[in-house]
Amino acid sequence: MTIRSTRHRCMTALFSLALGMAATMMPPSRLWAQEDASPAGFDAYMQLLAARARGEGVSEATIQAMTTGLTYNARVIQLDRSQPGASTTTTPPAYAPYRIKHVDAARIARGRAVYGNVAGDAGRIEARYGVPLPILLAIWGAETDYGAAKGGFDLAGSLATLAYEGRRRELFAAEFIALLKMVDRGVPKDRLKGSWAGAFGNPQFLPSVYLRIAQDGDGDGFADIWTSRVDTLSSIGAYFRDAGWKPGVPWGVPASVPDGFNRAGVASRLDSPVCPRVHARMSQWKTVAEWRALGVNAEGNIRDSELTTLIEPDGAGKPAFLLTGNYRVILDYNCSNYYALSVGLLANEIAR
């Protein structure tokens, strides 16, 4: 969706007074919900965000430090609007090229190297969060290539710009204020660099996720998801634990599907309220034993009683997988089948 850009009307003294009164009565998302964003009104919108931050208990020192000199970043909006929207075609792109790019030899090797470096902490992290370390490493590898690509955008500027632009105003306004709360908690301002969309650190958390999830895994008093391996892996582990990861269950296993298999007979009839196009590519839930009775055989270590769904990312006759509920936890982190499959396959390779 695009937003038509227009100039805001001149801010007269009367409007300024009304703006100040409105800021105390309603959140920025409602006050500006019907406005078209242009750089001219950014400073006025920042006054609203500052008022909301004060109302949520953010210190004046932090508000001033984080908003003084903040400017609208047109590049952020350009990048946001260039993101692919809903496809008009019925055939998704092939998975194989994505897999080759994201489960490559270099990423596998780097993941194994980090695994070796944190081997002494692996047991403690896995015991606390119930998630295999290779899965946590694969998320880290998928998000930032183990910290090599964390992003260099100023987070305050990016989040404020996205909030002001307006298509997802409430989401980004809340994330901007969460960023200020991070500073109030002691996160140094110079750490606040990341993606244009506001994600940061090794696991690419949003500010609200950092406040809710980030862990001080090494016990030094600071949840450092920028430079601490243990804090990074512990924080991803906490996310997966809270999202419902089931210990002792794989994310999925490869499967063989017989020729002439009746795929229509096992097609899902559910309409997921979250990421419907992602979930539509999966089958009905059946136990591994029930799949075997239909001729679909699991090719990995998984219990016969485990409920799974079938996915063939490149269509019939191509690689197939039986996916457990833990796969849905990976989707909770990033709702893309190609992302989730690649995380699972990368984890398998790291663990070899």
Model-derived features with residue positions:
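An acidic, Gly/Ser/Thr/Pro-rich helix-cap/linker signature
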Residues: 34-126
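Bacterial N-terminal signal peptides
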Residues: 12-26
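Acidic, glycine-anchored loop motifs typical of Ca2+
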Residues: 217-225
